[in-house]
A protein has these predicted regions:
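Expand to "…catalyze enediolate/carbanion chemistry for C-C bond making/breaking, isomerization
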Residues: 1-205
Length: 205
């Protein structure tokens, strides 16, 4: 209805193609089915507990999952094992996902949690940590490897070539990375420039 009304230039000429919803139960996932098809639907799941039932329900309606990897306080940042478990469940269920919150930076490290002067600091995941962990898991890496990737803080440990990305003696081919992008659809950042600037600074772009 929104898109029908706003299609006309007199009403803004805008089009919504993606929606995001928080869900806490499989029943809430099923209720979100009305958005699937009309929109690209991402359903944000809590990961304090095993999200398998939620991810399975998301697979059942053909939606995508969303995970929150940071927050405005240090205690809002999930543990690495929780993140890996989410990635594993998505892989097992064939569910694509996006990750958001705290992913302004390329690699894990201690950063300010907001842009405010004197903001509290916390140890955040980098977007490369999350995306590479998902890619390595897709080609068979176990949870131990994924945990180590999520904790990687040394840019020298990552080598980017035309046909591969290599990390500490293990590699993912470019074709496999492209395939992994169908699983790891996107990451969220408040800044468009920060991720690009950091990749340039690390000579990874």
């Amino acid at each position: 209805r929104f898109n029908d009304y706003h299609r006309d230039v007199r009403h803004g000429a805008v089009h919504v193609d993606t929606v995001e919803l928080k869900v806490a139960t499989p029943a809430e996932v099923v209720a979100a089915d009305e958005f699937v098809g009309a929109f690209d639907a991402f359903l944000e799941v809590p990961i304090d507990e095993d999200p398998d039932a939620l991810v399975a329900a998301i697979a059942g309606i053909g939606a995508k999952a969303k995970v929150r990897t940071g927050g405005l306080t240090a205690d809002a940042i999930p543990g690495a094992r929780q993140v890996v478990r989410f990635l594993r469940r998505c892989l097992e269920r064939g569910v694509a996902f996006k990750a958001t919150a705290g992913l302004h930076h390329a690699l894990r490290g201690e950063y300010a949690l907001t842009y405010d002067p004197g903001a509290p600091r916390g140890v955040l995941y980098g977007f490369l940590n999350v995306l590479l962990a998902a890619a390595f898991m897709r080609q068979g890496a176990d949870d131990g490897v994924a945990l180590a990737l999520l904790d990687e803080r040394d840019p020298a440990a990552i080598e980017v070539g035309d046909r591969f990305v290599r990390w500490r003696g293990q590699a993912v081919a470019a074709d496999d990375l492209r395939a992994a992008r169908h699983d790891a659809v996107a990451f969220g950042s408040c800044s468009f420039r920060e991720p690009v600037d950091e990749l340039h600074a690390l000579s990874l772009l």
